[in-house]
Structure formats: structure tokens, C-alpha cells
Amino acid sequence: MSSLLITGVACAQKSDVKSTDKVATDAVAPEQDSAAIAAAKKKAASDEKAKLPKPYNAEENAEARIAELVKQAKAENKNIILQAGGNWCIWCLRFNNFVQTTPELKQIVDDNYLYYHLNYSPENKNAKVFAKYENPGDKFGYPVFVVLDQNGKMLHTQDSAVLEEGKGYSTEKVKEFFLKWATKS
């Protein structure tokens, strides 16, 4: 009986060696394919990002601009949306482009909000402004949205991930978000 057991173990080891050799040989091609796919995806994202409008201004005084928007919001009876992110962030640029090129969403924003692209980048992290709004990017990533009332009071912070659909955004989810915090119905 012990010789049978030893033979069984030896056969298992022998077949393991063959399968390991095969796996090691086969693993090279998929790794090369994966690297090529990753490089192609990176290039496609870079090309897409290059074509999209760049709404964030790293040199702008965000604190002063938001103060101006609060005054304007009172006069126009609108809330404010701060879209936090940067020109480095493809999802930030996609969201901006999505809203600007979707007439229904653009109309909701134009009718109900003053919209500001709050820059977060290596050049200008706007740390003081972000701290005032509880550093939403640390919690949710970018883009992240902060809704302010006409007095500048924070009403809501919106994670953008729940608005995504595929490689873009859901019109219905974004519309629902915009309408929920709108000043007018």
C-alpha cells in the first residue's frame, strides 16, 4: 500500500511540473498582450483627454470666485454646484463635456445653478477651500460635486461614481441629481 501511495505522489509531482512549465510558457504571451492592451488604453485616454475642453483654472483664486458666485446666486435665486477636479482627470473632463453637450442637462444647470469648476491639481490644491467643504475628494475621488445654497451653505456632496454608466455618465442619474438640488422645479 505504501508503494502505491508513493507512486501516486510521484505522478502528481510529475504532472504538476508539466502543467507548471506550460503555465509559465503560456503566461508570457498574455502578459505581453496585457501590456499592449494597457498601452493602447492609455494612449486612447490621452487622445480623448486632449480633445476635451479644459474648464479648470489652476491660477484662479477659488475662494474669491466662490464669494462672487454666492452674491450672484442670491441675486439670481440659484444654487451653486462646485465640480471639484482638474484638467488632469479624464472623468472630470468627460462630465463637463457630457453636461455641455446634453441639451436637457445643460438647460437644467443653466436654469437652476451657477456652476464652478473648483481646481484640484499639483499646481494648486486649493487646500483652504477644500477643507471648508470637508475635503470631499479625499472621500470620493474626482470629480466630486458640492452643492451650495444661495448663502454659500453646503447642502450636499455628490459622489460622481453613482452617476457613471459604462465609460461615461447616465443622463437619467445626472438629471435626477441636478433636479433634486435645483431651486426651481
Predicted regions located by residue number:
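Bacterial N-terminal signal peptides
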Residues: 1-7
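Sec-dependent signal peptide cleavage junction
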Residues: 10-60
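Short active-site neighborhood of thiol/selenol oxidoreductases, capturing the structured segment around
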Residues: 76-90
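The canonical Cys-X-X-Cys-His
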Residues: 89-93, 145
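Typically the conserved alpha-helix immediately C-terminal to a functionally engaged Cys/Sec
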Residues: 93-108
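Thioredoxin-like thiol-disulfide oxidoreductase module
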Residues: 110-162, 166-173
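Short, solvent-exposed mixed-charge patches
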Residues: 182-185
